[in-house]
Regions:
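Extracytoplasmic "Venus flytrap"/periplasmic binding protein-like
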Residues: 105-180, 212-223, 333-334, 349-352, ...
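Extracytoplasmic/periplasmic solute-binding protein
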Residues: 187-200, 205, 229-289, 332
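Short, polar/charged alpha-helical segment
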Residues: 78-83, 96-118, 499, 517
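Glycine-centered hinge/linker elements that transmit conformational signals in sensory
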Residues: 232-233, 279-317, 358-367, 377-383
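Hinge/lid segment of periplasmic solute-binding proteins
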Residues: 79-83, 150-205, 220, 229, ...
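Extracytoplasmic "Venus flytrap"
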Residues: 83, 87-105, 125-126, 203, ...
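C-terminal lobe and pocket-closing loops
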Residues: 343-352, 365-497, 501, 536-547
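Short, well-ordered beta-strand elements
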Residues: 34, 85-96, 116-121, 144-145, ...
Length: 547
């Protein structure tokens, strides 16, 4: 959209006709003979008469000549006005530093191109959803645009708070919309066939492992969650980075009011969903009853709790930034995370595990839930039609990838500028670089970002590591049993409030596993009854593509 600076020199060639006397030294006079006609009186036969005669006369003259001279004049053309000169865009996102970093870094470049000033305002993640909702719902409209979790969009779209971006994107060739991977383009960015957000990030959970440790021990990367626990137990307490201190078999962030509540879905998913994406993992698609009071979710809670035995002693207080730092410091054999560790691990300034990190699709299970009995049953061709070597995988498209949305109540010129900024951030020239930098928190979401492995090699990955990292994400995207995030009205209350609280209390030993299950079940049912079961069920089925 904005590809260059408009400044140049206009060269004007002018043909000027100049009088020699005005353009050079005065010419030298010269004497010439001319013929003139004169009238004279003469005596003719004694009479005076007037006659006309022709005579030669010498005169001193100065000749006037015309000369042509080509003069080249250089004129500096005025730069065209920048389209958003004087416009300010207030963009709200979370503290980070990831996610906000590329917005802050590229904002001045966008200002140079367009004249618009980009102000990035940050708040803690736990406050972001409500801050956005309150600002628009109350008509305060302090913020013109937002970078947020696309699963929240339903609560902003239905009341008319978010700008519909469909027509803008259709008229914007620079965004190369068809290059955005179908899942992020057609699901994460869209609602009921209209586009409301611009992806800046692509999110899937993966498991990371130390390739050097597993190779030395003769172990394969984990295929099941039981494998994960066995590998974690094997390496826990060993010195994994050569500094003489014992390290950890598993590092998973579990701090409350952060982003920890998503992990339990990745663990529970392969036990619950086996019949394809439209089956879902959160609610019964016929009754909208929570899918937590069963052996599958109970098993997931047991696994979640056991991973803490092989983690740092303060794991319940760690956020994703903390566990990522531990992994790149060589202190963790395994970790569950989004795509960030893959790029953070190649940073020579912060990582001691360069070219020692592998990534795999999240582990699966050889047992799945019988939805009629609530019990776990073995995988077979019927119960697990998408199993690989007897293992049912259900990769979780958790969070959907940080995305940009625009306040529909903002001034038209500000909305134009905000769209231009998000388009600029999304365009390949910027995004293909940003997704290879660990500190951005942005993971690949364009098809070209998966196909062009050279960009990753140039960023510091070995060809094998790039293939491994991108392959794990591609395997997740291509899975027919992919798990979609919860996208019903007020999903934030179901997950970030009820689920997060119960998990943190369970992990801290404040409540038992069964009490945690009951607390989640009751909390979700209360929200559903308040909002209307039929409406919530229809929204849920619509989000799964099942209605």
């Amino acid at each position: 959209m904005f590809k260059g600076k408009y400044l140049g020199l206009l060269v004007v060639a002018a043909m000027l006709v100049l009088i020699a006397a005005q353009c050079g030294p005065p010419p030298t006079p010269e004497t010439i003979t001319v013929v003139e006609t004169v009238v004279v009186e003469k005596e003719v036969q004694g009479e005076t008469v007037t006659v006309v005669e022709t005579v030669e006369v010498e005169k001193e003259v100065v000749k006037e000549v015309e000369v042509e001279k080509v003069v080249t004049v250089e004129v500096e053309a005025a730069a065209p006005a920048k389209p958003f000169e004087g416009v300010e865009i207030n963009v709200l996102t979370f503290t980070g530093p990831q996610i906000a970093e590329p917005l802050q870094r590229r904002g001045p470049d966008f200002t140079e191109l367009t004249g618009a000033t980009v102000n990035v305002i940050i708040v803690p993640f736990s406050d972001l959803y409500q801050k956005i909702l309150t600002d628009m719902a109350t008509g305060t409209n302090s913020f013109d645009a937002f970078v947020f979790a696309p699963q929240w969009m339903v609560d902003y779209i239905v009341p008319g708070y978010l700008e519909d971006l469909t027509d803008r994107i259709a008229a914007d060739p620079d965004i190369e919309w068809e290059d955005v991977a179908p899942f992020f383009r057609d699901f994460s960015a869209s609602y009921e066939g209209r586009i409301y957000t611009i992806p800046l990030d692509g999110d899937f959970h993966m498991v990371y492992y130390r390739t050097d440790l597993l190779e030395e021990a003769g172990l394969e990367p984990p295929k099941t969650w039981d494998d994960y626990l066995e590998i974690a137990a094997t390496f826990h307490g060993q010195d994994l980075n050569g500094d003489g201190d014992p390290d950890y078999g598993s590092c998973i962030s579990k701090a409350r009011a952060q982003q920890s509540y998503w992990w339990i879905t990745s663990i529970a998913a392969p036990f619950i969903q086996s019949q394809g994406t439209s089956q879902g993992v959160f609610f019964d698609p016929e009754t909208f009853e929570p899918l937590v009071d069963n052996e599958a979710f109970a098993r997931a809670l047991d696994i979640y709790n056991e991973t803490s035995q092989y983690g740092p002693p303060d794991e319940l207080n760690l956020n994703v930034g903390d566990t990522r730092s531990l992994f790149t410091a060589g202190r963790c054999a395994l970790s569950l995370d989004w795509g960030d560790i893959g790029t953070l691990a190649i940073d020579p300034e912060t990582s001691v595990v360069q070219d020692k990190v592998g990534a795999v699709i999240t582990p699966g299970s050889t047992e799945v839930l019988d939805w009629e009995t609530g019990e776990l049953v073995p995988c077979d061709e019927t119960t697990c039609p998408y199993a690989i070597d007897g293992v049912n995988h259900a990769p979780f498209a958790s969070f959907g990838g940080w995305s940009g949305g625009i306040n529909a109540a903002a001034d038209d010129k500000v909305k134009d500028a905000a769209y231009a900024f998000f388009s600029y951030m999304n365009q390949p020239a910027q995004s293909n670089v940003d997704v290879t930098i660990g500190k951005t928190g942005y993971n690949p979401y364009r098809t070209s970002q998966f196909l062009n492995r050279q960009a990753w090699v140039e960023a510091g990955m070995s060809p094998q590591a790039a293939s491994n990292y991108l392959g794990a994400i591609e395997n997740s995207l291509a899975s027919p049993n992919m798990v979609l995030d919860l996208r019903v009205p007020q999903n934030q209350r179901y997950q970030q409030v009820v689920l997060d609280l119960a998990l943190s209390q369970f992990a801290a030993g404040e409540i038992t596993r069964d009490e945690a299950i009951q607390q989640i079940y009751d909390g979700w049912e209360e929200i559903t009854d308040e909002l209307g079961r039929e409406d919530q069920l229809n929204a849920y089925l619509g989000s799964l593509g099942a209605n």
